[in-house]
Swiss-Prot record:
GO function term, MF aspect, one: metal ion binding
Full protein name: 3-dehydroquinate synthase
Entry binding sites for Zn(2+): 186, 249, 266
Subcellular location: Cytoplasm
InterPro entries (alphabetical): Dehydroquinate_synthase (IPR050071), DHQ_synth_AroB (IPR016037), DHQ_synth_fam (IPR030963), DHQS/DOIS_N (IPR030960), DHQS_C (IPR056179)
Function in brief: Catalyzes the conversion of 3-deoxy-D-arabino-heptulosonate 7-phosphate (DAHP) to dehydroquinate (DHQ).
């Protein structure tokens, strides 16, 4: 099992990664001063619950913890105020107190919602991230928790670091191909923004999604977490370089919001967003990334590589202006200087709209 210590300006906590990592939960809880009898509140979704909830609950009950569970619908639409409020209500009805621990058993949606519940329940209680998807290798580390608003994604949230991340990779065996693809988008993102050697390894070793198995999958997760952790160590509250992790997310979040959450997976939207960011980078910096054939590379995994024909670019621009990186209505995007190096740049509306229209016509191959 791989062990890491995640360090931020306000907290240090362990990350445990490997097949069977869930088995360490009882000893981990004891190390966190959670004696038997402590109330534990597992938040999961209706996809994960039939697969792993009973297993995790039995493990904790055998260690004499007082275990409760709350199941939300799967999918991005669950990151709503209604589901957040219902989860808070369930926690109150179960009698959770300030010594209780919430366990987020699921993907990014579960982690975001459960983490935000933990951040705000009784002004903040402890929680543990237990990712069950590849996508959550990114969201489980760093303490950003949130719910969505109809006007934008992750607009209501907090920075609330977990007590630990327990990443049992055996849970990934039941992951559908589309969800595996979605998570791989964030792996690609980490390579593009921070690590040219990892990018080259991905191009050479992960030819298809079928290659995301065994040691190669574990290496992708380990590298992605290490890159995310290094950024969070430098900038916990996203006042500087942590914004680089939003590469592809300015347009990606706009697409998710405009199309309705669930029409595209998060990774599919981010993939289109990354290709658009490269498209803009070429025009902003006057250089070409054509030799990398990024759109062809993405398409080889089954990612969409162009805007859906149903979207209107002026509406996308308005959504992008609501992005959390924007200042005074000015869009700020993470652009690619070269493979492994990015920066945040302010862009004028007229230029962005022109580039959105051009990208809509040409796709990522422009």
């Amino acid at each position: 099992m791989i062990e890491r210590t995640i360090e931020t300006a306000t907290k240090r906590y362990p990350l445990l990664l490997g097949d069977g990592a869930a088995r360490v939960l009882p000893s981990l809880l004891r190390s966190l001063s959670c004696p038997p009898g402590t109330k534990l509140f597992i938040v999961t979704d209706d996809t994960v619950a039939p697969l792993y909830l009973d297993e995790v609950r039995a493990l904790l009950a055998a260690a004499e913890y007082d275990v409760y569970a709350y199941v939300i619908p799967s999918g991005e639409a669950a990151k709503s105020f209604d589901h957040y409020y219902a989860c808070q209500t369930a926690a109150l009805q179960c009698g959770l107190d300030r010594r209780s621990v919430i366990i987020a058993l699921g993907g990014g949606v579960v982690g975001d919602l459960a983490g935000f519940v933990a951040a705000t329940y009784m002004r903040g209680i402890r929680y543990i991230q237990m990712p069950t998807t590849l996508l959550a290798h990114d969201s489980a580390v760093g303490g950003k928790v949130a719910i969505n608003h109809p006007l934008g994604k992750n607009m209501i949230g907090a920075f609330h670091q977990p007590e630990a991340v327990v990443y049992d990779t055996s849970f990934l065996r039941t992951l559908p191909e589309r969800e595996l693809r979605s998570g791989f988008a964030e792996v690609i993102k980490h390579a593009l923004i921070r690590d040219r050697r990892f990018y080259d390894w991905l191009r050479a070793e992960i030819k298809t999604l079928a290659d995301l198995r065994g040691e190669k999958l574990a290496y992708c997760i380990e590298k992605g977490i290490d890159i995310k952790a290094s950024v969070v160590r430098e900038d916990e509250k996203e006042t500087g370089v942590r914004a680089h992790l939003n590469f592809g997310h300015t347009l990606g979040h706009a697409l998710e919001s405009e199309l309705g959450y669930g029409a595209l997976t998060h990774g599919e939207a981010v993939a289109v967003g990354m290709l658009f960011a490269v498209f803009v980078s070429e025009r902003f910096y006057g250089r070409s990334f054509a030799e990398h054939r990024l759109a062809d590379w993405f398409a080889g995994y089954g990612f969409p590589v162009s805007l859906p024909t149903t979207v209107q670019t002026p509406r996308l621009l308005e959504k992008m202006k609501g992005d959390k990186k924007a200042y005074a209505g000015t869009v700020r995007m993470v652009l690619l200087c070269e493979i492994g190096d990015v920066e945040v740049v302010e862009l004028e509306d007229d230029n962005l709209l022109t580039w959105l229209d051009e990208f809509a016509r040409q796709g990522g191959k422009g």
